[in-house]
From Swiss-Prot:
Gene that this sequence comes from: pepT
Keyword Amino-acid biosynthesis annotated: no
PANTHER family referenced in this protein's UniProt entry, alphabetically: PEPTIDASE T
Biological process per Gene Ontology, one example term: peptide catabolic process
Annotated source species: Bacillus cytotoxicus (strain DSM 22905 / CIP 110041 / 391-98 / NVH 391-98)
Cofactor note: Binds 2 Zn(2+) ions per subunit.
One Gene Ontology molecular-function label: metallopeptidase activity
Primary site of residence: cytoplasm
Lineage: Bacteria, Bacillati, Bacillota, Bacilli, Bacillales
A GO CC term assigned to this protein in UniProt: cytosol
Zinc in keyword set: yes
Cofactor(s) needed for function: Zn(2+)
Name of the protein in its database record: Peptidase T
UniProt keyword terms in alphabetical order: Aminopeptidase, Cytoplasm, Hydrolase, Metal-binding, Metalloprotease, Protease, Zinc
Similarity comment: Belongs to the peptidase M20B family.
Catalytic activity as recorded in UniProt: Release of the N-terminal residue from a tripeptide
Length: 410
């Protein structure tokens, strides 16, 4: 299995599948379509049936049940795209067998070094086989590690029919990194009662709480005149934007929060005297606090509109996704099975809230409760990204054990 994981993963990461937020096509980039087509062929070769790829690039397939028991249909999902934060073109994965726990020089020429000082978890991987970047790109373990693990688990189950399981559906989705993953996902066609995204990080990660999320776009309009004769005439849009921002709690920002704490995050601010635009994201685990945060923004805007004119401050706010805990709690047994699967494999489950969202956040509200499971990667979205092959192997066995436990408990 180990060599199969390495071969499959290193092949996948060399395919450029970065999504593109500016694009209006589905999926947002052609690389995802090409990758999807390759996965369709590979799924067929492995022996899965009902292998499809729709016009939006969603790949689905079935591993038929090999038991007479009435087992719920379960699904495993991963996403095709990689993050937009750093280049994902020409990825050159580097394999480090029996890692010594010390600093790894990723790129001598550019002096890119993965150090324990910067990444304190690094020495804990001593003895593992690590796959890193060459220091010039991201790796794409998010989420090609998940794709690799699902493929490898399906192949293993086909070749080990003594492991009894119900019907399993797999799906590979585009554009997760730009928040559009579930936008065109056909829950009915997928036909699973529950699913798991293989899209987590380090060993043991089991996540079924996510942020409630909203975005706020603010447009501030000013009036530009010659600064020499501007008294009582000029209205500086950039200053109005700064005034707005100053009324948000400074300590409730990503750089000051952790755990279950929510925040307001100014993603971008640009403009001039005539017009300025600010883009925020609002995040909180608690629905009441989430609504209160949105109301605070509305109240600040309304107060400032009284001062500067309604037409000069325009707010566009929309909800993005909600905390999946609300939809997963009624079917908590799916979390319990994943927990027990890890325990059976001597993996200590690490249950943490996701300070972000996964496809599962939205899918859970679309009728497909979907917790998230670790894949074995670290430092996603940048040149210091790496993955432990040892922990990819463990994640693959978690998939297999979940399938076995669902059948055993049916």
């Amino acid at each position: 299995m180990r060599q199969e994981l390495i071969e499959r993963f290193t092949r996948y990461v060399k395919i450029d599948t970065q999504s593109n937020e500016e694009s209006h096509t589905v999926p947002s980039t052609p690389g995802q379509i090409e990758f999807g087509k390759q996965l369709v062929e590979e799924l067929k070769q492995i022996g899965l049936i009902e292998v499809t790829m729709d016009e939006n690039g969603y790949v689905m397939a079935t591993l038929p049940a090999n038991t007479d028991k009435d087992v719920p249909v379960i699904g495993f999902l991963a996403h095709l795209d990689t993050a937009t934060d750093f280049t994902g073109k020409n990825v050159k994965p580097q394999i480090h067998e029996n890692f010594d726990g010390k600093a790894i020089t990723l790129n001598e020429e550019l002096n890119v070094v993965l150090t324990p000082e910067q990444f304190p978890e690094l020495p804990s991987y001593k003895g593992h086989t690590l796959i890193t970047t060459d220091g010039t790109t991201l790796l794409g373990a998010d989420d090609k590690a998940g794709l690799t693990e699902i493929m490898t688990a399906m192949n293993y189950l086909i070749h080990n029919p003594q492991i009894k399981h119900g019907k399993i559906r797999v799906a590979f989705t585009p554009d997760e990194e730009i928040g559009r993953g579930p936008s065109h996902f056909d829950v009915k066609a997928f036909g699973a009662s529950f699913a798991y995204t293989m899209d987590g990080g380090p060993l043991g990660g089991l996540e079924y709480e996510s942020f409630n999320a909203a975005s706020a776009k603010l447009t501030f309009k000013g009036n530009n005149t010659h600064p020499g004769t501007a008294k009582n005439k000029m209205l500086n849009a950039s200053k109005i934007a700064m005034e707005f921002h100053s009324q948000l709690p400074a300590e409730e920002a990503p750089e000051y929060t952790e755990g279950y704490e929510g925040f307001y995050h100014l993603l971008s601010l640009n403009g001039d005297v005539e017009q300025s635009k600010a883009y925020y994201i609002i995040r909180d685990f608690d629905r009441g606090n989430f609504e209160a945060r949105k109301n605070k923004i509305k109240q600040i805007v309304e107060k400032m509109q009284e001062k500067y004119g309604e037409e000069n401050i325009i707010l566009e706010m929309k909800d993005q996704y909600y905390n999946m805990l609300e939809k997963i709690e009624p079917v908590k047994e799916i979390v319990d099975i994943a927990y027990d699967a890890m325990k059976n494999l001597n993996i200590e489950p690490n249950i943490q809230p996701i300070r972000g969202g996964t496809d599962g956040s939205q899918l859970s509200y679309m009728g497909l409760p979907t917790p998230n499971i670790f894949t074995g990667g670290e430092n996603y979205h940048g040149k210091f990204e790496y993955v432990s092959v040892d922990n990819m192997e463990k994640a693959t066995h978690v998939i297999i054990e979940i399938a076995r436990l669902f059948e055993e408990r049916a």
